[in-house]
Amino acid sequence: MFHHSTHETAAPRIWRVGTLTYTAGGIAALFCWLLWGDFAWSLKERAAASVATLMIKSFEVSDFVYGLIILTIPNITNIILVPIVSYRSDRHRGRWGRRIPYLWMTTPFVTAGMIGIGASPFLGRQLMEAVGPEHISYRAAALTVFCIFWFMLDFGTTLANGIFVALVNDVVPRNFLGRFFGLFRGVSLIAGILFNYFLFG
């Protein structure tokens, strides 16, 4: 009589979302990449908002103009653009998936907007000299340049924020979504703390 001993090894747990499958290591890698992206994006958000506020106030605009440019218009673009782009992204089918092409599309706007805002004083002076100081003052020229690049930055940021959240819903398994968004919020707060600490001491 023979006794056969079998050694069963537990199969690694698998999580699925759509056509994607993850092991525990895959989930960890996914979280690291997404949260690293969120950390960098949060630093950008805080830097852009702080610089834009200081920059536009240096042009001595009224509180009404400040609120219109910095607060009102971004909210309007959010209301109008996000549903349109989200709808198109939901129905897009391509080699890189539904979200990545739209994230790539927003990158040039965000990059150009950030560089342009920083260069607004220089570009404003160039615009004044090109048009003529008798036609436009330095302050008006610099504010015009600032607004162009601020709207570019706002356009790219508004769309990227909506698409990134949709990407998270596409690639993170449903039973991890709550934990992910908790970490997402925590990383954003840590980025804010670090930014304020190193900038303001």
Predicted regions mapped to residue ranges:
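Transmembrane alpha-helix termini and helix-breaking/packing motifs in multi-pass membrane transporters
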Residues: 54, 58, 86-91, 118-126, ...
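Membrane-interface helix-entry/capping residues at the boundaries of transmembrane alpha-helices
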Residues: 67, 89, 103, 181-182
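Cytoplasmic membrane-interface "Motif A"-like loop-to-helix N-cap segments
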Residues: 91-112, 128
